């Protein structure tokens, strides 16, 4: 998984079309690219390109179904398979298999930027936690080959994943090491129960 913005995104995808699977779009709350504001629109999105071999691990996190979507389909009861007006049972199972209130994730992710950033391209830890949970399980290893200030490492540690980070700049490596060491892993209330 790699972050990018056009025209880099296109070059990234074309560098290995065979392994490119799909992309997410991260919608930020604050615009960027102000130095070019007189010549092009400000950017509030960044692409997240997913690459992998034959099949990429994917553990979708349920998203809430909007009220407007819920209002279009009336639940009429009906046992193990939903019985909805205006939608077949098969269609319901494919689109809303998490239950009446949740559906599959959409490819646009909305997360604000970090308030106290240490690096010019720093990503928000909650966004990275979302992506890590979407593609890995506890105890697996997360690699960030452009670690920067270590936000991916912080997210990985919080989620009980192993982490390998690579950073060329000594200043940012020190910042990342400190942040990751200070991060607290999440605690499960029932992890010791039989």
Language-model features, listed with the residues they occupy:
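Core catalytic lobe of class I
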Residues: 1-165, 171-175
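Charge-rich, low-complexity terminal tails
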Residues: 165-166, 193
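S-adenosyl-L-methionine
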Residues: 180-194
């Amino acid at each position: 998984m790699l972050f990018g913005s056009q025209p880099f995104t296109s070059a990234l995808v074309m560098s290995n079309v065979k392994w490119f699977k799909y992309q997410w779009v991260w919608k930020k709350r604050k615009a960027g690219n102000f130095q070019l504001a007189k010549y092009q629109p400000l950017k509030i999105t960044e692409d997240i390109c997913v690459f992998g071999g034959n099949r990429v691990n994917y553990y979708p996190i349920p998203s809430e179904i909007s009220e407007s979507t819920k209002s279009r389909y009336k639940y009429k009861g009906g046992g193990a398979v939903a019985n909805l007006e205006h939608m077949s049972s098969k269609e319901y199972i494919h689109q809303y298999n998490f239950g009446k209130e949740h559906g599959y994730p959409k490819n646009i992710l909305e997360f604000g930027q970090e308030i106290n950033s240490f690096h010019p391209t720093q990503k928000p830890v909650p966004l990275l936690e979302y992506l890590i949970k979407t593609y890995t399980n506890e105890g697996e290893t997360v690699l960030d080959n452009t670690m920067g200030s270590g936000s991916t490492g912080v997210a990985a540690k919080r989620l009980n994943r192993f982490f390998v980070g690579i950073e060329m700049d000594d200043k940012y490596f020190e910042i990342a090491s400190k942040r990751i060491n200070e991060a607290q892993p999440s605690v499960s209330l029932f992890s010791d129960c039989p």
